[in-house]
Amino acid sequence: NDPEVPGMWFGPRL
């Protein structure tokens, strides 16, 4: 859920 990292939106910071 990182707006600055669109590729990690559904990654470890879900």
UniProtKB/Swiss-Prot annotation:
Taxonomic classification: Eukaryota, Metazoa, Ecdysozoa, Arthropoda, Hexapoda
Name listed for the protein in its UniProt record: Pyrokinin-6
Residues where Leucine amide is found: 14
TM ranges: none
Alphabetically ordered keywords of this record: Amidation, Neuropeptide, Secreted
Any Gene Ontology CC annotation: extracellular region
GO biological process: neuropeptide signaling pathway
Record InterPro entries: Pyrokinin_CS (IPR001484)
Keyword Cell cycle in record: no
Protein family: Belongs to the pyrokinin family.
GO molecular-function terms, A-Z: neuropeptide hormone activity
Protein location: Secreted
Function description: Myoactive.
Tissues in which the protein is found: Expressed in the brain, subesophageal ganglion and in the retrocerebral complex (mainly corpora cardiaca).
